[in-house]
């Protein structure tokens, strides 16, 4: 029987819908303390976090992950109960199987086997686990990192167990992520009767040319590591629902996923210049969710690439595509960060599942990476 499978099931059974942990971290602590980890539970507001470390010297390698999962939606739409882990052939069904309780299980088993083989490993080993990744992400990893910085504790290498793989485990490593800058734009007009437009001002009509220009703008051309910056409108709301009323306001929500070619300050400046050019009366509220980051070829990326090749014979792809992750909070401290985890085809979906054999392969990759990075010779 696979320990990784057993551990994944233990975690899935705990219905830790964000920001709840439901005993996952207490169970993880039991496993890590046996291995000699000093475990600290860190509460920020009502969010539980875990920092566990084995050793006092550098370099420090940390596995990072989250015990919280997204809501299930309509449970009657699921093939099996989402919090009753169920095997079907080589597949394991359950909320969090792929994102990311399977990764955490693989991390623990890999660490058990690595420490058994290398009790006097180089440096220090660590885990950074949060229950606030799938939600607002304000009392999780970002606060743990701030806490560590305040006491001059630095992570040199960090592997985030997000489901990075596409078709088979290890085929893609995320060695960076685009930045995310969102905004809520409220354009003001004058409400009135549609039959008397001269007595009103339609904010939807006013903002339409500006939105067209924003959508057509080439913000940058990207670079060798990042695609071009993307601007997307996600919501437009205006009107009372009546057919004969010109609305008084229009609200637009949009988002940039931006490369290292730009800063969030440059994007804000360019957007506001376009809005001003079109003579709009507006309010604009910005939300910066994360800066872009990139971990270039170096000790961690090379160890991950080598481990994947050793275990699977795959030549992995380095990618910065996709959404944000908690890596965005860790990388700015100077930490080398990669994301490596299961395939992501069913994450956040009804009937989320992962391949049992891939979880075992992932465990081997994690263990091999530790050997590359934290042993001599």
Curated annotation (Swiss-Prot):
The active site is at 68, 133 (proton acceptor). Its cofactor is Zn(2+); Co(2+). Its EC number is 3.5.1.18. Homodimer. One of its GO terms (molecular function) is zinc ion binding. It holds the Pfam family M20_dimer. It is an enzyme of class 3 (hydrolase). Binds 2 Zn(2+) or Co(2+) ions per subunit. Zn(2+) 2 binds at residues 99, 134, 348. Catalyzes the hydrolysis of N-succinyl-L,L-diaminopimelic acid (SDAP), forming succinate and LL-2,6-diaminopimelate (DAP), an intermediate involved in the bacterial biosynthesis of lysine and meso-diaminopimelic acid, an essential component of bacterial cell walls. Coiled coil: none annotated. Transmembrane segments: none annotated. CDD domains: M20_DapE_proteobac. GO terms for biological process: diaminopimelate biosynthetic process; L-arginine biosynthetic process; lysine biosynthetic process via diaminopimelate. This is Succinyl-diaminopimelate desuccinylase. Pathway: Amino-acid biosynthesis; L-lysine biosynthesis via DAP pathway; LL-2,6-diaminopimelate from (S)-tetrahydrodipicolinate (succinylase route): step 3/3. It comes from the Bacteria. Belongs to the peptidase M20A family. DapE subfamily. InterPro entries: ArgE/DapE_CS (IPR001261), Bact_exopeptidase_dim_dom (IPR036264), DapE_proteobac (IPR005941), Peptidase_M20 (IPR002933), Peptidase_M20_dimer (IPR011650), Peptidase_M20A (IPR050072). Zn(2+) 1 binds at residues 66, 99, 162. It catalyses: N-succinyl-(2S,6S)-2,6-diaminopimelate + H2O = (2S,6S)-2,6-diaminopimelate + succinate.
């Amino acid at each position: 029987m696979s320990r990784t499978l057993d551990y994944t099931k233990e975690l899935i059974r705990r219905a830790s819908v964000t920001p709840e942990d439901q005993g996952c971290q207490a169970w993880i602590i039991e496993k890590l303390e046996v291995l000699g980890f000093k475990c600290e539970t860190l509460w920020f507001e009502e969010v539980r976090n875990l920092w566990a470390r084995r050793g006092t010297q550098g370099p420090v390698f940390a596995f990072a992950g989250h015990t919280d999962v997204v809501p299930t939606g309509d449970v009657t739409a699921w093939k099996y109960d989402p919090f009753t882990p169920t095997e079907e052939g080589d597949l394991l069904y359950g909320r969090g199987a792929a994102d990311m309780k399977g990764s955490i299980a693989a991390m623990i088993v890999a660490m058990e086997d690595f420490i058994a083989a290398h009790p006097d490993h180089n440096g220090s080993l660590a885990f950074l686990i949060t229950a606030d990744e799938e939600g607002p992400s304000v009392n999780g990893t970002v606060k743990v990192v701030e806490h560590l910085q305040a006491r001059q504790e630095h992570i040199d290498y960090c592997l985030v167990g997000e489901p990075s793989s596409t078709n088979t485990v290890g085929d893609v490593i995320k060695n960076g992520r685009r930045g995310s800058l969102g905004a809520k734009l409220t354009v003001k007009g004058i409400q009135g009767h549609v039959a008397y437009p001269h007595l009103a001002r339609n904010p939807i009509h006013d903002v339409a040319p500006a939105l067209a220009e924003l959508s057509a703008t080439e913000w940058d051309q990207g670079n060798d590591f990042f695609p071009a910056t993307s601007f997307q409108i996600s919501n437009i709301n205006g009107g009372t629902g009546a057919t004969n009323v010109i609305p008084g306001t229009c609200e637009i929500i949009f988002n940039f996923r931006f490369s290292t070619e730009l800063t969030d300050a440059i994007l804000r400046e360019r957007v506001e210049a376009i809005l001003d050019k079109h003579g709009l009366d507006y309010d604009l509220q910005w939300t910066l969710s994360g800066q872009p980051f990139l971990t270039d070829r170096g000790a961690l990326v090379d160890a991950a690439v080598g481990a994947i090749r050793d275990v699977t014979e795959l030549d992995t792809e380095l990618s910065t595509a996709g959404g944000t992750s908690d890596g965005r909070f860790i990388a700015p401290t100077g930490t080398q960060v990669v994301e490596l985890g299961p395939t992501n085809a069913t994450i956040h979906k009804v009937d989320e599942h992962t391949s049992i054999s891939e979880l075992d392969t992932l465990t081997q990759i994690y263990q091999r990476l530790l050997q590359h990075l934290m042993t001599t010779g």
